[in-house]
Amino acid sequence: MPPGELIYGFGLQLLSFSQRGKKKTIRVNADPKVDTGDSHAPVPFYVTTRGYGLLVDSARQVDFYCGDARLKPTHSAKAASGAVNTPDMTRKLALQDPGEITIEVPRAKGVDVYLFAGPSMREAVQRYNLFSGGGLVPPEWGLGFWYRAEQHGDTEAITKLATEFRERKIPCDVIGLEPGWQTHAYSCSFAWDSNRFPNPKGFVSNMGKQGFQVNLWEHAFTHPSSPLFDSLLPYSGNYGVWGGLVPDFAGEKARNVFGDYHGRTLVDIGISGFKLDECDSSDFTGGWSFPDFSRYPSGVDGEQLHAVFGLRYQEAVWQEYKKRSRATYSLVRSSGALATPYPFVLYSDLYGHRDFVRALVNSGFAGLLWCPEVRDAKNSEDLVRRLETVVFSPLAMVNAWYIKNPPWKQIDRVKNNAGELENDWQTLEARCREIIGWRMQLVPYLLSAFESYAANGMPPFRALILDHPEDSALAEVDDQYMIGDRMLVAPLFAGESERKITFPEGKWCDFWTGKVVRDKTISAPATTERIPVFVRSGSIVPLAQIGPHAGSSESTTLTVRVYGDGSLSWQGGGVAGIGLTLTWDEKNQKGSVRQNSQRARYTVAGWEQLGAEA
């Protein structure tokens, strides 16, 4: 490694961004506390600013020494200066000196290593994504707004919540049910609690009539009371978790048994997706998961199964949707290498806002999707800033599993569950409704970004440095990111007086006002009303009309924004049902629409130009 070459990647890293000078251990673990490489979704893949990527294909724990493993000195020398060095100073020296990447797989007899050529860093990532099978295009409803209800909710409570959302004009596509839908959780029965949900099929059908998809929480550890238990027993490990079986998802038979049950009993009554929880490990969270020395019928041990458990769990469920030619967009708490095609989005029980944004930025290096979910907040500012971030992410969700009322009605958890609402909760609700509305407007643009993900491997959400590896000013920017080919997002964080925003080369316009940005860096004060979002000057951006859900008739009507001279046309393909190419004639101040697919469902109602310069 020459001086100045930088390293990025290793999957869902929440605690660091640029990795040169560090040691990373690729090991699946929930809620990492320190920057070791442990993660919900670690990936033994990295890219460098020299324009290549490298994948170590192993289910064993892999150690990467990113320029910090150095041979001993062989000659005596005098002190270079009288300065007192610190660990941070020595890491900076590691960036300035030549180095090497050393990879150790202690418990493997051999591994396959794949080298992905660029010539640019972004092209190396694209090649990795295409090698993995290419990205996914979510269903429209998956890119709408999600809300997970309180865990004890029953048919009456969930129906009341859904009705309230429609009556108060809060857009929502997906309602998530947490552990209480089952007869037993921790471990799971995967059977409906008939007291809370006496008619599951009717409940799901009624939700669908209102435009809601239903998503179910679960984890894979299977309780003895489960209808699945006896058939899964021969295909499980020799150790249990929470009194339940550990399915051997490394083997096809376990995946088929587990998946078939889900298909017949849940997918076939209309369940649109699942939240696959607790499928990582637990060295930092109580040690509840299966041990590394456990054994499985497929021949793997616990260490290997931890590495692939989340991936193969996804596969077991996803195959049931593929059999039925149905799309899903689901949640999972662990994933890994080559997951690019999987229609699952990661989440965490951690809750640092900055860590969540950093995870979103890092996810684009490794073919992963990440949801910086909103659960609760310190105050109204924190709620607003977190909600602003999540609507500019792969999956926009409020996870209210432990509060009975939406957080905008009462932020305090105890008071919320006691029914003590804020006196003026409607004001905060209105602000949150507006922010959720932004998400609904963005759905066509997001769909086109995901189409590029599927077609050419372009990560829909990614770090600025990935597009501009030559720009040293972007090397450490882990709190801004690109969406698609023309949008830059810089989240705000509660309690901070201002934030610095750094721009890549080119001319940029404020997304909200069209104002042209002329500086390399600017500061946004905490009083900024809206999350800072910018687009490349010349961009055309379609915005959908806000409807009750992404599949509503209103949502297929577009207003097209033109920034600057409109020289960057926009295209939405037929895969996502958009099927339009939008262009702008600056001379005649006129937009044009060309339909490029018979599947086109969207129509253009009007155009507006922002940021035009005389």
Segments (PLM) and residue ranges:
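Catalytic-domain carbohydrate-binding cleft regions of carbohydrate-active enzymes
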Residues: 1-530
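Accessory, solvent-exposed terminal regions and/or long lumenal/extracellular loops of proteins
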Residues: 535-614
